[in-house]
Curated annotation (Swiss-Prot):
Lineage, opening ranks: Eukaryota, Viridiplantae, Streptophyta, Coleochaetophyceae, Coleochaetales
Function, as annotated: One of the components of the core complex of photosystem II (PSII), required for its stability and/or assembly. PSII is a light-driven water:plastoquinone oxidoreductase that uses light energy to abstract electrons from H(2)O, generating O(2) and a proton gradient subsequently used for ATP formation. It consists of a core antenna complex that captures photons, and an electron transfer chain that converts photonic excitation into a charge separation.
Molecular function as annotated in GO: phosphate ion binding
Family to which this protein belongs: Belongs to the PsbH family.
Chain positions found as Phosphothreonine: 3, 5
Designated name of the protein: Photosystem II reaction center protein H
A single GO cellular-component term on record: chloroplast thylakoid membrane
Regions crossing the membrane: 41-61
Length: 74
């Protein structure tokens, strides 16, 4: 058996910290799956916004569509 305890020594527990106390509720739902779509739609919206952000950055870097009428000297 892989989980068998060989000796009965005292197991040390981790120290409590403020960050741990704050993050504890986030871990309480570990392994549970909410029914339905949950936050999938919200994630899709943020992914789309991030894609738009990346396209804008790329266009600025390439001095393309967004900066056609603006002289850039760098």
């Amino acid at each position: 058996m892989a989980t068998k305890t060989i000796d009965n020594s005292i197991k040390l527990k981790g120290r409590r910290s403020a960050v741990g106390d704050i993050l504890k509720p986030l871990n309480s739902e570990y392994g549970k799956v909410a029914p339905g779509w949950g936050t999938t739609v919200l994630m899709g919206v943020f992914m789309a916004l991030f894609a738009v952000f990346l396209v804008i950055i790329l266009e600025i870097y390439n001095s393309s569509v967004l900066l056609d009428g603006i002289p850039v000297s760098w």
